[in-house]
Amino acid sequence: MSDSKMSSQDESKLEKAISQDSSSENHSINEYHGFDAHTSENIQNLARTFTHDSFKDDSSAGLLKYLTHMSEVPGVNPYEHEEINNDQLNPDSENFNAKFWVKNLRKLFESDPEYYKPSKLGIGYRNLRAYGVANDSDYQPTVTNALWKLATEGFRHFQKDDDSRYFDILKSMDAIMRPGELTVVLGRPGAGCSTLLKTIAVNTYGFHIGKESQITYDGLSPHDIERHYRGDVIYSAETDVHFPHLSVGDTLEFAARLRTPQNRGEGIDRETYAKHMASVYMATYGLSHTRNTNVGNDFVRGVSGGERKRVSIAEASLSGANIQCWDNATRGLDSATALEFIRALKTSAVILDTTPLIAIYQCSQDAYDLFDKVVVLYEGYQIFFGKATKAKEYFEKMGWKCPQRQTTADFLTSLTNPAEREPLPGYEDKVPRTAQEFETYWKNSPEYAELTKEIDEYFVECERSNTRETYRESHVAKQSNNTRPASPYTVSFFMQVRYGVARNFLRMKGDPSIPIFSVFGQLVMGLILSSVFYNLSQTTGSFYYRGAAMFFAVLFNAFSSLLEIMSLFEARPIVEKHKKYALYRPSADALASIISELPVKLAMSMSFNFVFYFMVNFRRNPGRFFFYWLMCIWCTFVMSHLFRSIGAVSTSISGAMTPATVLLLAMVIYTGFVIPTPSMLGWSRWINYINPVGYVFESLMVNEFHGREFQCAQYVPSGPGYENISRSNQVCTAVGSVPGNEMVSGTNYLAGAYQYYNSHKWRNLGITIGFAVFFLAIYIALTEFNKGAMQKGEIVLFLKGSLKKHKRKTAASNKGDIEAGPVAGKLDYQDEAEAVNNEKFTEKGSTGSVDFPENREIFFWRDLTYQVKIKKEDRVILDHVDGWVKPGQITALMGASGAGKTTLLNCLSERVTTGIITDGERLVNGHALDSSFQRSIGYVQQQDVHLETTTVREALQFSAYLRQSNKISKKEKDDYVDYVIDLLEMTDYADALVGVAGEGLNVEQRKRLTIGVELVAKPKLLLFLDEPTSGLDSQTAWSICKLMRKLADHGQAILCTIHQPSALIMAEFDRLLFLQKGGRTAYFGELGENCQTMINYFEKYGADPCPKEANPAEWMLQVVGAAPGSHAKQDYFEVWRNSSEYQAVREEINRMEAELSKLPRDNDPEALLKYAAPLWKQYLLVSWRTIVQDWRSPGYIYSKIFLVVSAALFNGFSFFKAKNNMQGLQNQMFSVFMFFIPFNTLVQQMLPYFVKQRDVYEVREAPSRTFSWFAFIAGQITSEIPYQVAVGTIAFFCWYYPLGLYNNATPTDSVNPRGVLMWMLVTAFYVYTATMGQLCMSFSELADNAANLATLLFTMCLNFCGVLAGPDVLPGFWIFMYRCNPFTYLVQAMLSTGLANTFVKCAEREYVSVKPPNGESCSTYLDPYIKFAGGYFETRNDGSCAFCQMSSTNTFLKSVNSLYSERWRNFGIFIAFIAINIILTVIFYWLARVPKGNREKKNKK
């Protein structure tokens, strides 16, 4: 925390100065005029004398009041609160007082300013202008146009800078914010509020600041701030990004530790300080009860959305920044909490001299009254800056009218909306209209002249002062030992690493599934793989299998870290945020993540290698074993650091996985086993030299074979008729054998087969360690200097054809969202208060198809009770809630964050998936809910969950086609969609894509689309809305509420949760259901005019009277103790249960049940159907939507294409035109084997897109009964097949022809039929890849776990397919795995199709030289052997026989159980495996993901 210093001596001087100033004024004028502006200026000038800055109080009374207040606090060190007998300083006490605590801290700092060195910082700027690159390529790239778009953008990037490429986001503006002043930034979304805050916080990566701009932070430049004081000027973004599996307490304590100052007080250790500070902010923002609850996110259960927002606020507050820029920080907070947050900022500003700025979209009058300064922005122009109390008066003098009951903030913002502002009578032609006219008026005003004068004085003052040195001293005093004074960080690099390691262990503790799964998976794979090579013999027959086992061991250790790339992308946005807060260096986090992974890596290595080494029967020697394990560990480290480096330099997971896989393929092929070193092609030999895995493999082979003698397992010739032949006339077939010798030296074998030597063993360990250190340095450097994602102005994306139409349509207008750039700037829709007028409901009513459905049914509930099990404890979330929603009424559902509002909506709409409804009834017209209930309602969720690749119109049509009655024609549904687009004023962006944040719809547009998706379904019963105004500006929130009012007026029943209703918005609701903590009802009844009925109820039962100027919503939250820091006088749940109003509610529910149940029910069979559309229609629409999603995701498709092309070409050219000798046949077999390597990456690329579809379906579409689970899963499976066939075809051509397999079909003139079959096999493999990925994801929650499972299954398939070990080698209990392995049949089919029916010609070094007995020719000696063993011989000049073990490729195929006659059978079996995958995907998805039955269990009374 920061502060300014003022000694008691200075305080007395100020008091004396004030009294002197007053007396001199009276003396000279002889008349008392009160405390006027002149006096105020004198006081401020005096204050500057003492503090080198302007004092925050504008009056002597305020200053004296401040001095009095400071005398009330003890000024003690509060961090060891257990030893202080003052509950107001103890954050764990119910009597904790945040304001008292802050005052005490200020007094503590002032008690020893030389030690604490409190600091403060203001900002002033002149001619501030921000501009960005205009992006004309605002169409969504697809597979067909993505490359062209990339090329054109690249060309434009290298063009010389010219003004046409840029547009101004912020026009020239001036302002000054002094320490102690709280400033609010007002403007509609897109006005430039976020850009202004980012500019002040020096967070400008992605846009530029004009050269003419002058910015100073009390004498410090923006460069100084960015380089040395980054954590003292922060920008808190609107989004909440946290590690979901960390608890709230751990999240905040981590931030507190990293900003713990060195000068925190004598005897206070860091941990005590950090825990105390975290507790203080948890208590301040009402988070103490969530200390041990996970933060969570949209998909991981945790605290509520409002509480998560408060966690973000608390985390930013703990940074202790002097200048804090808050961007829409109150989004998702209830009105009382939002007010409390602004009060906390005010307290910090007034007492600790901080300089907070906050852009706020919904600001109550109570909140506005707390602000000192206000900035009003209009399309990038500053149209006012000054005292908040003067702004309203300034614009009223200009000629604008402020309506009654409209808050000042709403009035100021409404001036930037032409449809909402209203000039005073007689000023219609005098007031400015455009943003430029407003700015011109402002810059010609006396207020602006006064401002420029003050700014000029401030700049002169900054030049004269020694702030730079004073501020540096204060900064250095806070820094821990071993921290560079110029560093922006508070703690040293090694402390950052230490805290990062501790946090990562807490993350693992919060979600141990991935490390446990990884270790368990390694153990299982160790057992499986080692059992394949179980107990290898000590003969030459084990040479190949010993090498294969070592090869697999190296690969498994090397690539066990591949999935670490995925976790990097999860953490990246959080690390970038913390870097901007100056909590830690990204490099410190990178090192911490590596250190914290060490125990997991060691556990994984032990679980695999200990089992594998001894079961395979590698060399039983302690020294040899520990060398093996040492090399394996370093191999894991090298590859982990390499994969992390790839992830650090990539911008997306698919972009990282593709090069990682190609690299993996290169390393596998050039390890030295697949292609032995002597057989590598000359052009590619260098790859082996830079391959760290190759060095590991060589050392491990040397470690295993050097100095050992192996018994020969096979002689040539041998068998019947050769029993009595002398060893001198036989030779061992193993490489390195010596004629006549029964033993083969392992050293000679390595030298002959691989050119491996013992002298390289320890050298290679050093090289491997060098690689590990090198890649670690690369990784740390990349994370440190990577600037992260560039900020982009919001642009709206259209399809290319739609964009041209849109540009033609809006060419005449170029107004609107200035932050959005040229394209979005053309979206000029109006959010006027009367946005939805009656004409829109009636203008098309005559057609019949677009009439809004009338509703005559009443939904009500009684004694609804819901509980969940949290850590073996049953916790009641809703406690006997009663209520109803009648047609034509809007019922507001309110309560503090976490009170159970969303849970109640989920229970009422039958959307709960966890927990149990233990009691209560939900009835429609007195009848229990039937199967069509969910289809009869609309549910507008708080999260705007949409597919980013669909357009607005497509999303609405998809909902209409599947949710409206199947009897309604397509044209009528399309007409209704157009009607809703017009109704919600989405015409300008109806053909825009949803997109992602920054490139797509903005928050307001997404909310309108969410509402629209439900409206086009024509919900006949009622409409639920969960926080529909969250994140919207006041005008848009108002227009949404007016829209709800119009819907209700046309018979719709609406139940709506709302957080921050102004008095105006509250007036739009008819009834209120208010929940207090624990899901208990505090009130259900009419609101009355100006909420008077509700106010009367609470005042009747003992509440303090509601002030006339108070917002009833905020007052009510205070009364029931739902606002942070407030305490209820009584339990209002008990008050409600004992009230006459409660009895009236119960009687009304009983009356409705009795009366309504007598009404006739709708007996239309179609009305009772679970889904409106038939299954075939659901399937077709879902499949097409998924195909379109992939087509509009060119990054995914091109990553897939790049992967298969690069992998296939690399594979094909590594084995280019493989010869038909013995090594060549083995190379061709391994080429087929390597062809499967991209499997893992293809699955990992696909999973995120499957998850996106599944999230949209399970979160929104399944509960709404849009379409069935079977249509969803069938559509996902079907839509992937065309793309897999396409990439399979590309892979076939890139691999089949370079490898030269077609040459093997030439002798039998079967090139075409064998080529066609090979194409079918290759494409079938790619289809199998997709179905296997979907199978693994069908029942998995996390994509990481599905990817791990797919890797496990893939490894098993590779291991048991017969390439590395055939059925004659496998232990008996694994034969079943060979038989039921799809890759067995695929490999057999591909090998037989590619290699069959041609001749073998041995290379010179492959011949075995045999000397026949004296007097015998080679023919007579070897012909009997060749007849049963195969092969051929050549007679050499010296009479010896050069024997080749094979003469036909069919002999080789037979040795690997691949028969040409079975090729079509094997293809058919592989297709059957694809079908099995599809069937299992459907079954497992139904078992694991489809809700069955209901969550209702009634207690028997």
UniProtKB/Swiss-Prot annotation:
GO biological process terms, semicolon-separated: azole transmembrane transport; fluconazole transport; phospholipid translocation; response to antibiotic; response to cycloheximide; xenobiotic detoxification by transmembrane export across the plasma membrane
Keyword set includes ATP-binding: yes
Effect of substituting W326A: Impairs NBD ATP-binding
Compositional bias segments (type: Basic and acidic residues): 8-18
Record topological domains on the Extracellular side: 535-548, 619-622, 676-764, 1217-1229, 1302-1314, 1377-1466
Record CDD domains: ABCG_PDR_domain1 (cd03233), ABCG_PDR_domain2 (cd03232)
Effect of G672A: Leads to selective drug-sensitivity
Pfam families xrefs: ABC2_membrane (PF01061), ABC_tran (PF00005), ABC_trans_N (PF14510), PDR_CDR (PF06422)
SUPFAM superfamilies xref list: P-loop containing nucleoside triphosphate hydrolases
Domain ABC transporter: 150-404, 859-1103
Effect on the protein of changing P676A: Leads to selective drug-sensitivity
Consequence of substituting T658A: Leads to general drug-sensitivity
Impact when changing T1355A: Leads to selective drug-sensitivity
Effect after changing A1346G: Leads to selective drug-sensitivity
Protein role: Pleiotropic ABC efflux transporter that confers resistance to numerous chemicals including anisomycin, cycloheximide, fluconazole, miconazole, ketoconazole, itriconazole, nystatin, terbinafine, amorolfine, brefeldin A, amphotericin B, fluphenazine, as well as estrogen. Plays a role in farnesol-induced apoptotic process through glutathione efflux activity. Mediates in-to-out translocation of membrane phospholipids including aminophospholipids and thus regulates asymmetric distribution of phosphatidylethanolamine. Exhibits nucleoside triphosphatase activity.
Designated name of the protein: Pleiotropic ABC efflux transporter of multiple drugs CDR1
